Amino acid sequence: MSQPMTQERAAAVGSAVNALWDPNSLANPYPAYERVRALGEGGVLEAQFPDWKALFLTGHAACSAVLRSPHALSGNGIQNLDGERSEGVRLLQSMMLFHNGLSHQRLRGLVSSAFTPRVVEEQRELVRSLLDSLLDDLAARGGGDIVADVSNPLPARVIMGMLGLKGDDEARFVGWTQSVADLIGGMNQSPELMGRIDADAREMRAFFQHLAEELRANPQPGLLSAMSAVQDGGERLSGDELLSNAVLLLAAGHETTSNLIPGGLLELSRQPDAWAALVENPRHPNVADELLRVVSPVQFDGRTLSADVSVGEMMLPGGNLAQLILGAANRDPGVFSDPDRIDWERPNSNRHLALAAGPHYCLGASLARLEISETFAALATRFPNLRVTDTNPPFKPNPVLRGVQRLDVRVD
């Protein structure tokens, strides 16, 4: 796997790795990913410098193997930080996303028992009703910003309803999800940004602690009430665990769909044949998976390898940090032919890793697919002549949870 680290190669690897985090790569990170892929072997690039080393994974097989391995630990760096010094860090430390093994199984089991396929399917009519209303408003204006007008409010209202949160707090909750996203993957985590995140985390803690007390005394419909009451062998979620995982569900239930909708429309604006095919068959069963593959709302995922992980005949050595470039894995030409092209007939679209795999597979995967398929069916049916008027929109300063800040469209 490793090649001799000559001075010339070290410079090439350093340049390729630095480009991954370059703000100029946000609008189109894929050339940077291909540079990393070209320098590696078998979809793995070993980057070793005097003060740090890591494995950068661009291959689908390598990313899939690490995601599924019990030796690939999530959140080790988070758990080693001092949660007493940062409310934001403390918030992350109890999220099941950053736990492993039995601890992760316990947290996921307690939360997933309140997040069933039946509950998700029950959201379909709500999603359709919300889309009707949001798209009516968009049609009345002849267009607008798809982020502010559709992709932010839709998943926010759905997950808030599922959790049992009041609709009049929507703006506050959306702001909180942005703080969580900035904490997990944002660029330039300045003292000012961290101060805002910590302030939001304190506000979240106070809000959810008070709400949990109310729900335990007076249960109401919704996942939060179920999470407050659910027990496994007499054990229930602690205060920190309830808070952190409620915030995780709120943020994850919002960010994936919120970023995918404008990202998908932007890609489709550049591939008019794919848009025309969608208009012709707006309920094609591959729509959600093909857009998840191409857009990859979560571009990176990190793991610490506690032991060797095998990828075919290759061995990834334990003790390494592994940076999984999911956006590259989902466009691996060895797995997906013509990978940059949106192809609704692609036979293996569902092999994407946009929702992870293995023990940390996205708990809300079925909800994300439902929202994506219903949204694009509604857009293609209502607005067959939809046009993206700014094909070079601004992106959020977040290479991990990549998303468009604003996307102007016309629907007249």
Functional labels for PLM-detected ranges:
Residues 1-412:
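Cytochrome P450
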